[in-house]
A protein has these predicted regions:
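Conserved catalytic-core segment of NTP-binding enzymes
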Residues: 87-176
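Short loop/turn segments at strand-loop or loop-helix junctions that form parts
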Residues: 11-12, 60-65, 121-122, 178-180
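NTP-binding/hydrolysis catalytic cores, primarily Walker-type P-loop NTPases
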Residues: 182-204
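A short acidic, often aromatic-flanked loop/helix-cap motif at beta-alpha or helix-coil junctions
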Residues: 68, 161-162, 179-189
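Hydrophobic, Leu/Ile/Phe/Ala-enriched alpha-helical segments that form helix-helix packing faces
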Residues: 1-3, 82-89, 137-144, 200-203
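Phosphate-binding loop that captures ATP/GTP phosphates
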Residues: 2-60
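Cytosolic-facing regulatory segments adjacent to core modules
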Residues: 39-55, 62-99
Length: 204
């Protein structure tokens, strides 16, 4: 939408990019994983031949045939994949969707990202979990193990003005939010998010 070539890349164990995007092409993320593990492939060429483009303009990799293949990627292999994606120069923006784990936050992989977006619905339960997470981040930062709080944003999804409440803690900044869209398809929800221009402040 802002004229930037954007890649959506998921390393979630059960992530399926094809739920959000559709595009032509016969290759999947399996081919990228094989190339990473073989260490013999020109990764820029592999990305160009494997990536698909949705009608929205977003680029993505179709999910592989087995979730275990993603789980099998080592931290070093994921790091090399991210570095190769950035070094390829193909994309202006890379959105990396990943499972939340403290192990991931402690990884030096977080040094490769410019912003970390955490999702919350603003409910009492969600806010309590969010607070516990951030308190743990603060402890790890004081121990010198990580330095990520300044990169963190909170994005509210399925937020209710009646029962939801914003999180106000530490250095975490609010990116914006969206209400629950009842009976809407995935594509309709994406269209509504785009209209909110939530992510523009990250592109400054």
């Amino acid at each position: 939408k802002c004229g930037k070539k954007t890649l959506y890349f998921s390393s979630e164990e059960l992530g399926v990019s094809d739920l959000f995007f559709m595009g032509e092409g016969q290759f999947t993320f399996d081919d990228v994983i094989y190339a990473v593990k073989s260490k013999k492939t020109n990764m820029t060429l592999k990305f160009e031949s494997t990536v698909k483009q949705d009608i929205s303009g977003v680029y993505f990799f179709s999910a592989g045939s087995k979730a275990l293949d993603v789980i099998d990627l080592s931290e070093d292999e994921v790091r090399q994949l991210i570095v190769d994606l950035k070094m390829s120069g193909i994309f202006d923006v890379i959105i990396w969707d990943m499972d939340f784990r403290f192990k991931s936050l402690q990884s030096d992989l977080m040094q490769l990202v410019s912003d970390i977006i955490m999702i919350s619905d603003g409910s009492e339960t969600s806010n309590l979990k969010f607070k516990r997470m951030y308190e743990s981040v603060e402890v790890l930062e004081k121990q010198g193990k990580i330095e990520i709080s300044a990169k963190m944003w909170v994005l509210y999804n399925k937020f209710s003005n009646k029962t939801g409440k914003g999180v106000s803690i530490g250095e975490i900044k609010e990116l914006g939010g969206a209400p629950r869209y009842e009976h809407a398809s995935v594509n309709q929800i994406i269209e509504q998010f785009l209209k909110l221009n939530i992510f523009e402040k990250l592109l400054v």
